[in-house]
């Protein structure tokens, strides 16, 4: 097995995978381990019995008996005992926050009293429980108090010096640690068992609020003298109530020390829950705390896993065997309770408004566009298909809350959770008229993860077109964290090499997808979104290695911030303000989601263009939104074959947006573009141009403003590999497209 080391007995092989060493003692070593059947992490205390004398062996088995007896939320749980000829394995609950001594040492002046009160109350609660069972710990110290951060608890551990006692009868064994031991133990006298734990509690409280032990001198002799004289100094910053409680516990005479009942009722400890543990806090102290349904479910899992039959499981639980059967049962039970507790916390934290917004974002409204439509996007009416969903995708989308992309009437957005049918078919409002053949379209390149190949049912729409680019398989599992199942289902068995080998892909396997929304719908949704804000983002920044280092946002109060981003970005409908990728503010433009340096090119949004290689070589790109953009340019016609262009489009990010350029009005000011609209950081050979069909816009401009114009295009050097462009919005339409001829913005 993975963690099995030479020298360990075969009884533990196959049950636990032993990992790194957590700590060492004189006779024992504590290792991190994983329970094979449940996968839960545990601590395994491995004790070498060959090194133990008779007295130490007696203490060892006394520890086991006491730990079996005490089962409390504030005491580290013993799951299993494996006894072999040479070693004894104690399978214990694993703490995740270190011990209290290290925690105190990080606070030179001690903890604030509210926090100290919280932890001390839990320790008192655990010791009170032990004393009621007539078990004395006798080695209470901060090193034996372990933090469990996920549970918000502290727990007692190391019952190596613990013992059973009878009320009224005194013990004689001298044990414990000098700095925390009561005077009567150090003298070797007979002592009252509960009183020695009270003394140790006083030392622990002193350390919590003061940051150092009360009796800690240069050597053991001086320390012993201070303990016998009961001399210590409480700093003045400690409150009177806390000082009084410490004094009541650190009494030289055991008969004058406070009892546990007096400590629990002390005024300083009032107002704090002595045990924040609830039913769902682990460890589970008894199988009787589970419901009948949970109990039967766990037994059924164990039977199916060939752990034991039902009768053997029930018998082991009723007799407290502390064997592998009971360990497996309680580890499974605690995992179920932990998941149930986390689910309840999430349910309480989710407000109805958040849930409603999440469902609004979740319904997919995307269609496939065959390859032949990409060459004539503006002249050919686009078809809107009904896209049947697989049950896995339908459930995953609803749960994971990805933002929908148009095609739905704003008045019906709140009804999206009820549209749980296998197909989605949305008809535009009757008032919406199909646009003329010369209508303007806005293109945006995005990644998507769906492979829908269903037939299309044409519906004439005034449209907004969004080209979507599939991410590569290498980015598949990191591009959207919230849909791991779908990431695994998609393209099973494919590799990046297969992409490069596919020279001619059929239209339905095209990576470029389209999404349609009517401008009226988008306009209405823009105002709706602007008034109500937006949900949280689920954007993943792990798509490329360089992604997180080069991210930028636009935080302008006016205008429209352009961004390209992954499918998992929490984006609103095109034209809505502040719904870009990442986690931008509701009133700001969308954040810019950069690709890695080798991913930028000029595919033009539709196969064309092969420029933008990692070396920065410029290529050509055809116009993507103008009325005459149906035919490729000679440069793109002479480029690589269609299959190669498709592969290139998977690797290169194209920036293509519909905008307007009329008269003497520039979208990017030639004078200020390098310092305002385009953010600069590092040098590059990339250039950006904004061009428009028709007459040259430079006719009415003075030479100073047109010095950067070449071939009817404004060319600007860019100093980073991803750009942010701020576009002014048309107030009348609320869209980027206006009534003037459309133009393109290319990275060339």
From Swiss-Prot:
Residues 522-532 have a biased composition (Basic residues). One of its GO terms (molecular function) is protein serine kinase activity. Residues 575-592, 600-614 have a biased composition (Gly residues). Ubiquitously expressed in all tissues examined. GO terms for biological process: protein phosphorylation. InterPro entries: Kinase-like_dom_sf (IPR011009), Prot_kinase_dom (IPR000719), Protein_kinase_ATP_BS (IPR017441), Ser/Thr_kinase_AS (IPR008271), UBA (IPR015940). Residues 16-269 form the Protein kinase domain. SUPFAM superfamilies: Protein kinase-like (PK-like). Keywords: ATP-binding, Kinase, Magnesium, Metal-binding, Methylation, Nucleotide-binding, Nucleus, Phosphoprotein, Serine/threonine-protein kinase, Transferase. Pfam families: Pkinase. Residues 533-542, 629-640 have a biased composition (Low complexity). One of its GO terms (cellular component) is nucleus. Its EC number is 2.7.11.1. Its main location: nucleus. This is SNF-related serine/threonine-protein kinase.
